[in-house]
Design a protein with these regions (language model features):
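Single conserved hydrophobic/aromatic residue that forms the stacking wall/gate
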Residues: 1-8, 12
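Short glycine-enriched, charge-decorated loop/helix-capping segments at active-site entrances
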Residues: 44-49
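NAD(P)-dependent dehydrogenases' Rossmann-like dinucleotide-binding region
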Residues: 9, 17-42, 53-59, 69-80, ...
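Contiguous beta-strand/loop segments that form the cofactor/metal-binding neighborhood of enzyme cores
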Residues: 55-137, 165-178, 214-215
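A short, polar/proline- and glycine-enriched secondary-structure boundary/capping micro-motif
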Residues: 111-115, 140-151
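Active-site loop of classical SDR/Rossmann-like NAD(P)-dependent oxidoreductases
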Residues: 156-169, 185
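Adenylate-forming
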Residues: 13-17, 116-118
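C-terminal helix-rich "cap/oligomerization" subdomain common to oxidoreductases
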Residues: 95, 170-215
Length: 215
């Protein structure tokens, strides 16, 4: 349940990126990074970067492609000396030529923040956007540079203010039948992402096990 509802925690990020993609004709390439401390591989036994961190970016890209199924899926995984997965790589492609790559790992050293770092970049036709969800400014470039949006406040008059406020108000509107359940937060969206994760995990196993066990 937690994983299926995890898209709600990134609602602000999805809204901002969806708005840019809609207004600019979609994206050509998306690349997503989520890196966490190396000790996560041992602190969370049985968890993998696919399911613990990459899942959030899969939800986000799912909303950008309007839930369309990818026609290409491939993945690779790396394992540490203890045999725990510490890096997951994934590639998804869609019929219109859109591509998305994902990197999620437990690789950052102790000197870095315990929260690690996240980054997402979207490239379209003559524009690009970069999102740092941790923290969360959004930067956009086209012919000009758009200054970062450093606060969780959208200037659109039809948009609620703040990530938590948006989630609560959206929930209230949905239960009162004032608006439909947002794409990316529905039960079927969670099932679709879980299906993608299953296919990515299988693809990574079929691609061979990369490790530094003999180093």
């Amino acid at each position: 349940t937690h994983r299926m509802s995890s898209a709600a925690s990134d609602v602000y990020k999805r809204q901002a990126l969806q708005s840019e993609c809609r207004s600019r004709g979609g994206f050509v390439y998306a690349t997503c990074y989520r890196m966490r401390p190396a000790k996560h591989a041992d602190d969370y036994p049985g968890e993998t970067p696919f399911h613990l961190t990459m899942v959030h970016d899969l939800y986000c890209v799912q909303s950008l492609v309007d839930g369309k199924e990818p026609t290409h899926i491939s993945a690779q995984a790396h394992y540490n000396q203890k045999g725990s997965m510490d890096l997951a790589l994934a590639q998804l492609g869609w019929p219109d030529g859109s591509l998305a790559t994902f990197s999620a790992g437990f690789l950052t050293p102790e000197a870095m923040s315990a929260e690690g770092f996240d980054r997402m970049e979207i490239f379209g036709k003559n524009w690009m956007a970069r999102m740092h969800p941790n923290p969360r400014p959004l930067e956009v470039w086209d012919e000009n540079y758009v200054p970062p949006m450093t606060l969780e406040i959208l200037t659109d008059s039809n948009t609620n203010t703040g990530m938590l406020a948006e989630e609560l108000r959206c929930f209230c509107k949905v239960v009162r039948d004032l608006e439909p359940i947002p794409k990316g937060t529905r039960y079927q969206d969670g099932i679709q992402v879980m299906r993608w994760l299953d296919r990515l995990t299988e693809a990574s196993e079929n691609s061979g096990k990369l490790s530094n066990q003999d180093d």
